[in-house]
Every structure is written in C-alpha cells, then in structure tokens.
Amino acid sequence: MRSSVRVLFVCLLVSLSVLTAPAQPGTTQAAVAQSFPSDDPVIRTIWDEGVERSQIYELGQVIMDLIGPRLTGSPGMARANDWSVAKYAEWGIEAYKEQYGTWRGWERGISHVDLISPRVRSLEGMAAAWSPATEGPVEAEVVILADAGNSVAFESWLPEVSGKFVLISRPETNCRPQDNVEWFARPETLARINEERRQAVAAWRQREENTGVDRQVLPERLEAAGAAGIIRSQWSAGWGVNKIFGTRAERAPVFDLSCEAYGLVFRLAENGQEPVLRVNAEARFLGEVPVFNTIARIPGSAQPEEFVILGGHYDSWDGSSGALDNGTGAVAVMEAMRILKAAVPNPRRTIIGALWNGEEQGLNGSRAFVEDHPEILDRTHVVFNSDHGTGPVTFIPMQGFAAAGGYFGDWLARVPSEYADQVTLEIPGSPESGGTDHASFLCAGVPAFSFHVGAGRSGEVSTSSNRWDTSIYTWHTNRDSFDKIIFEDLRDDAVMTAMLVYLASEDPEIMPRDRRMMTEGAEWPKCRPPARSSAESNR
C-alpha cells in the first residue's frame, strides 16, 4: 500500500459528508434520505442493494477471522482463493483462480519467547514470516550485534555468535509515540528525547554499515556463523505495534519482539547481566507452491471485448489478520461485484473483479496479469484499485491522464451527493510507479486509478491513509485486525465503487490514453517484470 502521492494541481469538488452508520455491527439501516442527481434507476438500485442488503460485515468476518492472514504461498492464501471463487458462484458470478507462478510455501505455527534469566518473564513477540522452526524449545544466551570499527573487525567477531541469540535492531530510547511525548513533555525534555533518538539512529546506522553486510542479508550471515536465532524489533512508533515482515533465513529462527520487550533484553545484555532466552517456534515449509489471482467476470452485453477492471490485493502480511491491508479492499471488490450482479446483470462492457496475490512482494500478481493478457490492455476503459485501508474515499489522483478529470467529474455528478461531495480529484496528477496494483497497469499506459482516504485530524486534505493512523497502527503491523474496520465507511466505499464501475461500463467510448506533459526530468514509469517464483523475488 502506498502512503503518499505528489500533488500538482487539485480540483476540489466539495468537502466531507457522512452517511448514517449501521445501527449495530453486522447490520445496516434502510437507505436514509439522499440526493440522487439523476433519475437513473440503476444508481438507485445499486444504492438500495448496497445499503439495505449489505454483506460487507459477513464478508469481512470470514476473510479476517475465519480465514485469517493471507501470506503469499501460505495455506491461508490458498483457502482465501478457494473461498472467494465459491462465494462468487453463490452469487451467480463466473470466477476462477488464475495461476501466475509459484512461491515459497510456509505455514505458521505457535511461537513463544521467554526471558528465563536473570529473571523470568514471557515476552511479547512472534516469529517472522517464513521463519524456520526450532526443534522444540531452544535456550541460549544473548549477544548484541557488534559495534565493529570495520568489516574486518566484524568478521573477527562473528564466531562469538555461535549458539547464541543475536540482537540486530536498534533499541528505542523510549517506546512512547511521538505525539504522546510532544503533548506531555516539557520543552527541555522533548528536546533531550529528540536529540537522543537522533544520535541513536545515526550511531546504529553506522554500526550496521561497519559490518560490510547489507541489512537485508545480515540474518543469513549470522545464521551461517552458527547463531541460534535472530532477534529484532521493527517498532511502528505507536503503542504496542510492530511491523511484521519476512525473513530468508533457512535454519535460525527469526523473532520480532515488542519495543518494550526488546529494550529490556537489550539493556540486560548491554550491562553484562547475561540474559538467557527460551524460544519455541513451530512452522512448516511446504516447498514451492502454485500461487493464484482470483478473477471474477460479469460479461458485457453490447461490447463484451471491452473491459472495466476493479481490483485490490488479497494477500497480506501475517502479523495479524491483514484487515486494513488489504482485507477491506478485497471485501470492497467482492461486495461491489455482488451489487453489480444484482443491479446490472447485463452491463455494456465486461466487468472484471480481480483479487490480486503477491502485492506485498512487488505487485507480482497484477504485473503478471498485465504481462499475460496484453490483448485486453488497449480495450480496457479504466481500472479502479481499492487499497486504502478504512475510511471514506476522499481523494482520487488522475495519474497524469489528460482526459481523466472529465470522466470522473461526469461520473461523480451522477452519484448521490453523499458520496460525490466528499471526493477531491487531483488534476492532472502524476503517474505512480509502484506502491499498489494500479501501477502495474499505469506503466502499460492503461488508465488506472487508486482510491485514497483523505482528511486527517485537522480536516486537511491528505493523500495518505492517515485518517485512522493507519501507517502507524495497522499498516503491516501485529494489530491489523477485524476490529479496526469502520464498516459504515467500507459499506459506502463499496456502493460508490459499484456506481463508478457501472457508469464506466456504460460510457460510449473508452478513455483516451493522452498523457499530461511531464515535468523536466520526469518520465512515465516503465513496467517491471513480475517475480514468478520465490527465487526471482525482488523484495
């Protein structure tokens, strides 16, 4: 999920408006008074179907709670693919899995880490994705990544890691979020904390550089030297949240500890107090397994060989449930397709609903789709991408397509003002080169647009998913769970998306490919090939 875009010129349509929320979780109220700017009966049917008979709560509960995280190559991702195909079939929508490659298969089991000396305490933490298992509980002493003066000194130190857990992350000087410090600290205290953090960041960066080993492969180097395991902490700068990513280690388990737990262990080791950890990690490597996108289609009636594509990535990191990144996007895609099947069973153009896989490893599923289907690119009217977390859609960049603003202006003028009035268009915008799946189409010259959440605490328009502190508290974290979803906003996003897809499907002509004049030194992004196996991974 990308967190920002460049703003060049913004066409403001109007400001925020809020719909009445569901009376209780899992239910929706009847459509409240709304402003339909046209007499189009399909728009009214979409509204009624999406508001009065919404299924977003049920879809979200199954995806986030029952299926859970959807790490590429995991059984969870495979279950999600199979379930969505079956659910589409229940709605009478043609759907299938389309293989685009293979990936390293891995299944997470139970993981646990305890401090057993100099005192006993269970520590908050979990194994990294694709971490090797232990053969039962493993106890070992702890050492800190050496503050070696150069790579030669680092190589001389390496034998000391044999049989030990190695701490490889910088400890935080304190585990309070910055806004908490700024709110409560005296000016002199705030200045001290900020300066300590600045110095600590610079010193640790130098320590890493002095090893002569790239940060991404450091765990593998320590593993080769006989480390019992790797301990890190990727704090997300908020209360109780860490980013949980993967590892390429093949023997030594890799654990992420909370900010507080990591700081405790680090200080004990730093002060010569000889901490000992007991680590237990269960996991199964499943070999190289096939990976799929889920593709659904509502065939067009008049121009079936032209397409409107609605997509969002289905895969997630597995530190939690992958709710806001991007379970909400997957729910919005499926619910919009359900609504469209009920309200527009015979659209003018073929509508494709795509649940992409492998986005978190480099947009691999969508890049493969673009590479595998060159025949549809010139006949695709528009691509909509849903990967914005939670909150109402309030900002849509036009991605450098000269005609896009006119199309979006026309579509938004025909949807209820409760939706249109909250949307700001960036005209003409600039093409994004990565971040989420619409970029796979942009580089090929296909008009593709990603929805964004807008206003933050002060009400300013923003291009990032900051409305609910997403970048700190849910984006790739151990707290990205079902309870973070704002369901009335997700309902409204799915309904508005269905309306935009319907209106685009009925346009007389497909959107022109004319591009804005790029600023000096800027180029239209070039397409990158997908990684079709874990061996080809570029992340």
Give the predicted meaning of each segment.
Residues 118-122, 135-142, 149, 159, ...:
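Metal-dependent peptidase/peptidase-like ectodomains
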